[in-house]
């Protein structure tokens, strides 16, 4: 499930309108609408707010957000699967903390 789909699924499952969620996030409803449609990327700072609205783990929601960011970088690349495998190997070999230090 993509981040955009997760946003919509959470909103609908909790019975909120886009207008209500936008108001809780203090953003324009048109901006929120674009988040759900995948026409605009949500700022990372909003992840905690969204998680709090739905009473879910920010870490879990952040995984969807990060996956969406990776997807947005690679979706047009012919060798996307190879690149993802290389990154996965680097994480296993060097550890994510080592990669962040570099």
Give the predicted meaning of each segment.
Residues 5-24:
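Short basic helix-loop element that most often maps to the first helix and adjoining turn
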Residues 62-102:
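Short, charged recognition helix plus adjacent turn
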Residues 1, 12-13, 41:
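Short amphipathic helical patch at the helix-1/turn junction of helix-turn-helix
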Residues 25-41:
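Recognition helix of helix-turn-helix/homeodomain-like DNA-binding domains
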Residues 7, 18, 29, 44-47:
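Helix-turn-helix DNA-binding elements, focusing on the entry/boundary residues of the two helices
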Residues 45-60:
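DNA major-groove recognition helix of helix-turn-helix/homeodomain DNA-binding modules
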Residues 7, 21-22, 32-35, 61:
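Conserved hydrophobic/aromatic packing and binding residues within compact polymer-binding modules
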């Amino acid at each position: 499930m993509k981040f955009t789909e997760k946003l919509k699924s959470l909103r609908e499952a909790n019975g909120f309108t886009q207008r209500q969620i936008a108001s809780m996030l203090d953003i324009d409803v048109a901006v929120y609408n674009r988040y759900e449609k995948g026409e605009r990327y949500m700022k990372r700072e909003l992840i905690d707010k969204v998680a709090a609205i739905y009473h879910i783990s920010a870490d879990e929601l952040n995984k969807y957000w990060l996956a969406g960011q990776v997807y947005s970088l690679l979706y047009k690349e012919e060798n996307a699967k190879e690149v993802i495998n290389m990154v996965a190997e680097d994480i296993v070999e060097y550890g994510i903390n080592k990669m962040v230090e570099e």
